Amino acid sequence: MGKIILLDENTINKIAAGEVIDRPASVVKELMENSIDADATSITVEVRNGGKNLISVIDNGCGIMREDIPYLFERHATSKIKSIDDLNRIITLGFRGEAMSSIAAVADIELESQSNEDILGTRIVMHSGKIIEKKEISTSIGTIIKVKNLFHNIPARLKFLKSDKTELTYITDTVEKIALSNTHISIKYIVDDNIVFQTPGNGDLLSVIQCIYGIKTAKLMLPVEYSNSLLSIHGYISKPELNKGNSKQIIFSING
């Protein structure tokens, strides 16, 4: 008998999910980018136990239309593109249609969402990729998604995660970079019930720098402005007395 077999759909989904979602920070990135693509002006990110037990993202974006809900957790289902030609003019952060299905395959999910075109919102609860609850609810326009028990059904992947403290470092780095690149969005970051920072969402980069790094650091920043017919550069660079032994605090955002 031959040795090559066709894998079942459940195994395929879990393997594929590991390529997209490799740690809690990946979940945070994908969910925040979904909120940004939904034109949210306010995003709240909450994590517990390094994101292993809970990752919650709340936004006031356009929400998910009720008729789109059945496709939300299907692989390669997306509202961002319709054909290969759209890749040449894509303006969204997400487009592959893999993030939500990948997250659902390796975690428990609670989702509440309402679009401005629907009278009622929808609540969905999922366990290991399967919907166990779905009902209509009254809620605000936008989306609330809670990802719980990440990798509970893939012990090998869970084993290779670092300590809660280390995973939290990756998450914090992700949230900070997204906040710095999206100064027009108010972003609140909560860790284990404590607010770490909240940006004003007023479009002022220096205000975001102050929220994340503190007023002392903000006062040591110098503005950088340059533009020509091809590009424009806007940002801040620190004075010499504020220096680090590595390049981790050098952050670039292209077409942000």
Q: Model-flagged regions — what are they?
A:
Residues 1-256:
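N-terminal phosphate-binding caps/lids of nucleotide- and nucleic-acid-binding domains
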